[in-house]
């Protein structure tokens, strides 16, 4: 699972402020009449103002493209997201590799060939063994936190503990210095998407310093780390051994990028609005505009020109534990679905500029294959009468009381404010909600363990890559249920037909063919009312008046820092 940076990686329809340039960006600078020229965009210092991030910067411990777009400025991977605005930006493209990989054996084997001329920031060549070593170290217990897919997908991955004790993962083969082959336990047509994860970044074994590596990593991207203060500061300068001749996806316009983390969103937005000093050439990769700025957008044309809008493939929802009463009865689950007032939920998170109502689990967009459905139509404000009718059929004519768990922090978009909106809506239907607020630190631990999981909880799911698989598999595949903790299949669904369809879709290596199958599966599962979709978040982000080509990409739902330039 990937969470939004400020909310906790996606694709859906994107609205850009300005016209997309041929290079794949947009002249979003607003205050300049000069068009953005990707051939002449070098120079200057870009400032990045963030709320979160920078807690980790080791490619092994980052979760997919965690930390926004920043890691991909230092770490190249076998594949990467296509660096363009719009729907085309939801597809993977080759990065270190010459292509998206050659599948065989029903997508259980994937072969990649590295490009010529690849170099680390010290000038040494990058080879297939460097990529393998980078992947292997991500299995080390000393470097936790990365995406779990390789542990599950690679043969022997579940028991492998990394290379520090001399072990070798035999399911990754390097027959020569440019070839790397992956042997998987089961078919996975999405492997080219997974190969964008930072775990696929090459690491030279001779320069691996273990847990200290993030302080001075060896770069394969356009920038190298000059300074890293965990959780606070990151300064990037040019890697002189990188060039666009070997990397056609990263424009890498600024000479220097200075990132500050740990700022309050209100402070970030105030600094971006005022744009004094270095803040004139600043962006954020995790702070949506606040109420004050939203109110000004309609009346302040100059500010409106410095906003980009988009979405991240994410759904906020109510989760049922269908093994616990009263939610073992589908009529009770349906009653909750009818009772929900989505308009009040959207108002709680800032209004329609920042959220759109959801009746499907999959977000909008061709990449996900969403098929529109609304099996329990309640309109914008809910249907408490229909909910009461269903409760009566289920034997709860006098209503019932339920506990609702939620994190005690509103920044992720499913905290106390949303819980209050849900509580009020259910009250209208005769359902009394007992709020159960948990700390951010405890929330995933409690809700992710079946033995401690509350019957009803607020949850969020975001796309690790823009496709239906990483949305549906963790939530609905019965073989993904983890009794000891870390479980995301909160409904505890274990339907052989669903599991079989997941396996069949996983064999498909053409994303365009797989997408409608994922959409159809979502539509079929939705009939069981295993969860109640609430809303899909939107991004509305400011950028400084001296920033150009700041567009929100459709993979992660934030600015693509690799494409931004400063005046």
Language model segments and positions:
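Surface-exposed binding/hinge segments that line
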Residues: 113, 130-132, 143-204, 227-229
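Extracellular/periplasmic solute-recognition and catalytic clefts
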Residues: 145-148, 152-154, 226-237, 258-324, ...
């Amino acid at each position: 699972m990937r969470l939004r940076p400020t909310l906790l990686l996606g694709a859906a329809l994107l609205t850009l402020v300005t016209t997309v340039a041929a290079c794949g960006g947009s002249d979003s600078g607003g205050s300049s009449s000069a068009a953005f020229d990707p051939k002449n965009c070098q120079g200057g210092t870009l400032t990045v103002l963030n709320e979160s991030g920078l807690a980790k910067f080791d490619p092994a411990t980052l979760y997919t493209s965690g930390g926004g777009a920043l890691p991909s400025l230092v770490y190249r991977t076998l594949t990467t997201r296509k660096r363009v605005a719009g729907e085309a930006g939801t597809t993977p493209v080759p990065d270190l590799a010459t292509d998206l990989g050659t599948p065989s054996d029903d997508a259980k084997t994937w072969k990649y060939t590295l490009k010529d001329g690849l170099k680390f920031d010290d000038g040494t060549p990058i080879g297939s063994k460097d990529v393998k070593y980078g992947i292997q170290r991500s299995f080390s217990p000393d470097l936790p936190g990365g995406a779990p897919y390789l542990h599950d997908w690679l043969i022997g991955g579940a028991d492998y503990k990394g290379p520090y004790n001399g072990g070798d993962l035999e399911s990754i083969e390097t027959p020569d210095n440019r070839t790397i082959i992956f042997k998987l336990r089961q078919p996975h047509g999405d492997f080219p998407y997974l190969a964008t994860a930072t775990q696929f970044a090459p690491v030279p074994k001779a320069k691996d310093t273990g847990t200290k590596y993030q302080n001075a990593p060896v770069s394969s991207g356009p920038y190298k780390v000059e300074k890293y203060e965990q959780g606070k500061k990151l300064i990037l300068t040019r890697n002189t051994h990188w060039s666009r001749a070997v990397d056609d996806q990263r424009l890498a316009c600024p000479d220097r990028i200075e990132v500050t983390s740990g700022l309050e969103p209100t402070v970030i937005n105030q600094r971006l609005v005022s744009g004094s000093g270095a803040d004139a050439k600043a962006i954020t990769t995790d702070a949506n505009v606040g109420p004050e700025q939203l109110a000004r957008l309609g009346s302040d044309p100059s500010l409106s020109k410095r906003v980009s809008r988009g979405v991240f493939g994410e759904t906020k929802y109510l989760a049922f534990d269908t093994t616990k009463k009263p939610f073992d009865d589908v009529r009770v689950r349906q009653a909750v679905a009818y009772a929900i007032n989505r308009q009040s939920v959207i108002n709680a998170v800032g209004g329609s500029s920042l959220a759109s109502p959801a009746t499907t689990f999959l977000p909008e967009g061709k990449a996900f294959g969403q098929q529109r459905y609304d099996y329990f139509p309640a309109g914008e404000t809910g249907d408490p009468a229909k909910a009461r009718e269903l409760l009566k059929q289920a034997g709860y004519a006098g209503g019932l009381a339920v506990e609702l768990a939620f994190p005690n922090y509103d920044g992720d978009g499913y905290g106390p404010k949303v819980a209050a909106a849900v509580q009020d809506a259910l009250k209208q239907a005769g359902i009394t909600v007992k709020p159960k607020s948990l700390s951010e630190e405890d929330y995933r631990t409690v809700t992710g363990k079946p033995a401690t999981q509350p019957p009803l909880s607020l949850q969020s799911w975001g796309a690790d890559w823009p496709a239906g698989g990483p949305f549906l598999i963790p939530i609905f595949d019965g073989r993904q249920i983890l009794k000891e903790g870390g479980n995301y299949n909160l409904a505890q669904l274990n339907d052989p037909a669903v599991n079989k369809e997941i396996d069949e879709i996983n064999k498909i290596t053409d994303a365009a063919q797989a997408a409608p199958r994922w959409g159809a599966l979502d539509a079929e599962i939705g009939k069981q009312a295993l969860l109640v979709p609430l809303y899909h978040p939107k991004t509305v982000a400011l950028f400084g008046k001296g920033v150009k080509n700041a567009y929100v990409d459709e993979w992660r739902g934030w600015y693509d820092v690799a494409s931004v330039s400063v005046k």
